Amino acid sequence: MVSGTDTTEVGATTKAPPSEGTEGILDDHSSNSQPQAEKPAKTHYPLSFWLAFLGLCCTGLVSALDGSIVATALPSIIESLDGGDDYPLYGQLADLWGRRYVMIGATIIFILGSGLCGGSSSMNMLIWSRAVQGIGAGGINMLIDMIICDLVPMRERGNFIGLLFLFVSLGATIGPFVGGILTDRASWRWLWLLILLQIFYINLPFGGVALLLLILFLHVKWKNDLSTMERLRRVDVIGNSILIGATFAILYALTYGGTRYTWSDPHIAAPLTIGLVGLVAAFFWEMSPWCKYPVMPPLHFQNRTSAAAFFISFMCMLLAFWINFFYPVYFQAVLIASPTRAGVYTLPRAIAFPLFAAVGGAIVSKTGRYRTVHLVSTGIMPLVMGLSSILDQGSSKAEWVIWQLLFGVSGGMMISTTLQAVQAALPESEVATSVGTWSFVRSLGTIWGLSIPAAIFNNRFDQLSTQFDPSIRALFTRGQAYEHGTAKFIQSFDPETRQIVIQAYIEALKRVWQIGIVFGGVTFLSVFFEKEIHLRTELKTDFGLDEKKKGEVAKEENDVENNGTTVQ
């Protein structure tokens, strides 16, 4: 085992009995308990661990780079297709078939999607090929966190999640520059060249290296005591089907609402209603006695600290996308910056985010306390929103640089510490489903994090556009103000009209930030529902890294017969 401690068996991921993982038991390790101040023992990680971790980091880098490059050039549809793929189904499959095979499978799907993109002969084929990539990328993003949880004690997970985000943020930072340069020359020819260059020089080589590292070094234990038919019976088909259907219905409505159709149009109202009802139905199904193997066990939400941490995770992703999507509008529509220069202007938060993800993880690992980190980081968020609301044409560069740095501090510290709060109150047997649920609620946060501020922005802009000439106003109807928020479009107007349009953008953005203050404040207040629970320093899992030598294979085979645990 990685931690050097003995592995103890834990139950399958089913509904836990009331005595397991409940708040009453875990209150013994609350914020006033002495174990929180204990210094964790030094953990030794073998070379095989670091090589496997390198494979995970390379996979995360490719996934982040892929999404950020093409999304810059094809933002609305492509970003939407990638927004709802982190389904808890991956967590359940990883429990039943093991982390190694599911992770390798997700990576292969991602690489396959890349190949399909390269062979696409039309925009529609490209979009659906990107959807295949999204399915693989969703599994990659979730399974990386899950495997880290399997290989690293809870107290130390923040360090590794922060280190992982250095790789992920590198991809997310480089991508917009490449995509922005191509967007400046936007045409189908340039976009097609972008796709081909990305696939043949980034996705396939780096993805191939990552896949090879995973195949060679990601050898983890796996509880293999069930037949294939029994595993299939334990997949929550009903719950997963409802969740996937509801998510795509919401995704469709939020993608086209206010743009292609009005919000009251049946094309939008119907799927949005169906999606929201579906989420409620999925929740009740998971809580019902008929669901024997829930994909999102009720235990996750019955515990106060875990439930609060899930909500905070959702809100933090919502606010992150709130800022990530509307600062570029300010740069391009108000400061008249090109897409490439707007990408440069986002560097402060792009640099601060991964650095403070590492800092936040290190603080939690050192102190064993996550609640203080959450109070500080969520307290910064409404401040950032408030400061952003005063930005206009005359704002100095120092202002928007500092505001973005503050967001990087806030978002970075949260991204690497919320999972520990989710899992602190849960037994180790819930690692897979808790990571799956955590990924799902964060994925929902990304969807609403674009849709809510976009609706606010478009509604406010429509109100302000009454002062425009009717011919000009027609250009901004049905959500086109967001789509037309580019320097090239704004500069196409005569100076007088241009200033009126820019002022409308300033006022619409101000409303977006003002309402963002409320969302940030709610996130801050929700931290008070968390309890400071002792973070375990020992690792007890059925899925830890295998360090056995080849000469011990026979002994391992006997272990399979005795307790059903094998090595992948």
Curated annotation (Swiss-Prot):
Database matches in Pfam families: MFS_1 (PF07690)
Gene3D superfamilies associated with the record: MFS general substrate transporter like domains, Multidrug resistance protein D
Residues bearing glycans: 303, 563
GO biological process: transmembrane transport
InterPro entries: MFS (IPR011701), MFS_dom (IPR020846), MFS_trans_sf (IPR036259)
Keywords in alphabetical order: Cell membrane, Glycoprotein, Membrane, Transmembrane, Transmembrane helix, Transport, Virulence
Transmembrane segments: 45-65, 101-121, 134-154, 161-181, 199-219, 237-257, 268-288, 307-327, 344-364, 372-392, 399-419, 437-457, 515-535
Region (Disordered) location: 1-39
Gene Ontology molecular-function annotations: transmembrane transporter activity
Location relative to the cell: Cell membrane
A GO cellular component annotation in the UniProt record: plasma membrane
Principal subcellular localization: membrane
Membrane topology type: Multi-pass membrane protein
Keyword hit for Transmembrane: yes
Biased composition (Polar residues): 1-11
Similarity-based family: Belongs to the major facilitator superfamily.
Reported function: MFS-type efflux transporter; part of the gene cluster that mediates the biosynthesis of thethe mycotoxins phomacins, leucine-derived cytochalasans with potent actin polymerization-inhibitory activities and monocot-specific antigerminative activities. PhmH might be involved in the excretion of phomacins.
The protein's name in its UniProt record: MFS-type efflux transporter phmH
Gene behind the chain: phmH
